[in-house]
């Protein structure tokens, strides 16, 4: 399933987050390891100062696996279905693991690119790196 994640970097964690991204250790140990870096590269900082990204998650509970990794740096303010569950082939049972080959993530990310500014660019300017 796809989720639209809204989150704020925890106060004082900006440099640590940037270091984890630059060293490619963000999400290390998770089954979704590389996705964390991709999410941060695609994330947008919106006018309400939340970072937003589209997350692919196969867990029965949204972000069950990913949440502890994200919460090390972020306060997750909202996690919502990014599209109609009835239309998700993985979710409705018509095609297990369909999210891996579905184009809905790309479509959602393209839509998200039209909002805010690149999150990493903003994070670098805040940390002066």
Report residues per predicted region:
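Short S/T/G/P-rich N-terminal loop/turn motif that feeds into the first structured element of a domain
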Residues: 1-51, 56-70, 90-129
